[in-house]
Amino acid sequence: MIKSQVGRRYSKAIFEIAEEKKQVKEIYEMLNSAMVLYRTDKEFKHFILNPLIDNEQKKSVLNEIFGKDNSENLNILLYILDKGRMNCIKYIVAEYLKIYYRKNRILDVKATFTKELTDEQKKKLIDKLSQKTGKEINLEIKIDKDILGGGIIKIGDKIIDGSIRRELDNWRKS
């Protein structure tokens, strides 16, 4: 709970800075890269979280990794480090992305089907969902043979279940 609150607070401030600098995408990419490195590289994570290692050493490493492209944007990451919030980077990035999606009217949609859709089917689905919601669609497709046929679409908290599995379950209950 506390980490998600920290994520909201930091991401809001970072997003405002990013908008002022017209660096929204670049800052997101830097934060996301830091998060991926933090989550996948145990050595990096232990190094960053180790209280016995001086922050100047940590800053030097972050500068080495992320300072090549834009050292000014690196200050955001260094600030997060100075405040001892690198352990919240996942939440900061997630909340930052939510703000970005909300401001740019982008909607995350997760769809599950029994087989891969063709490019034409994907385009039709995206167009239909975009038309219904009035937003740009970011579609993630998952394959699950257990649903037998049809599909399941998840938009935020809403689930549209048109799977044959659900139909069979409903038929058995009646």
Swiss-Prot record:
The keyword Ion transport applies. It is a peripheral membrane protein. InterPro entries: ATP_synth_OSCP/delta_N_sf, ATPase_OSCP/d_CS, ATPase_OSCP/dsu. Disulfide bonds: none annotated. Transmembrane segments: none annotated. GO terms for molecular function: proton-transporting ATP synthase activity, rotational mechanism. This is ATP synthase subunit delta. Keywords: ATP synthesis, Cell inner membrane, Cell membrane, CF(1), Hydrogen ion transport, Ion transport, Membrane, Transport. It comes from the Bacteria. It holds the Pfam family OSCP. The keyword Metal-binding does not apply. PANTHER family: ATP SYNTHASE DELTA CHAIN. One of its GO terms (cellular component) is proton-transporting ATP synthase complex. GO terms for biological process: proton motive force-driven ATP synthesis. F(1)F(0) ATP synthase produces ATP from ADP in the presence of a proton or sodium gradient. F-type ATPases consist of two structural domains, F(1) containing the extramembraneous catalytic core and F(0) containing the membrane proton channel, linked together by a central stalk and a peripheral stalk. During catalysis, ATP synthesis in the catalytic domain of F(1) is coupled via a rotary mechanism of the central stalk subunits to proton translocation. It is found in: Cell inner membrane. F-type ATPases have 2 components, F(1) - the catalytic core - and F(0) - the membrane proton channel. F(1) has five subunits: alpha(3), beta(3), gamma(1), delta(1), epsilon(1). F(0) has three main subunits: a(1), b(2) and c(10-14). The alpha and beta chains form an alternating ring which encloses part of the gamma chain. F(1) is attached to F(0) by a central stalk formed by the gamma and epsilon chains, while a peripheral stalk is formed by the delta and b chains. Gene3D superfamilies: N-terminal domain of the delta subunit of the F1F0-ATP synthase.
